[in-house]
Amino acid sequence: MENENLTKRVAVLSSPEYARCRKKISEGLDLIEFNETLQGKKVLLKVNLLSARSPENCVTTNPAFVRAVAEIFLERGAKVSIGDSPASVSTAVAAHASGIASVCEDLGVPLVDFDDPVPVVLEHGTYRSFEIARPVL
């Protein structure tokens, strides 16, 4: 990314309820000076779809939070996708139960699963090879 300070800055803000989290997310991005244009860049929102549970169970990433983040990045020109690979059920089943699938449908962004890993080989580094989900590349 163009902003070198991005990896060095963190903003922690409180929101009394998910319905109003978009404003806090925007404030947080301003606090870390995330002002990059994302025009045409791919952004994968990696959610936590631990199981096929509704948002009220607080098991998965809340769909209101996912919607807010996705909308902000879409407005900045990003090509957003949302994904995960739950261990207990399929991504589609967990996303439907959690409300994440509705967010994807409403915003026209793809829901991707991480069930198709591809090998990655590096010349240098601690790990010379590993597998990563195809949508992450």
Tell where the protein language model's regions lie, with residue ranges.
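N-terminal and secondary-structure boundary signal
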Residues: 1-137
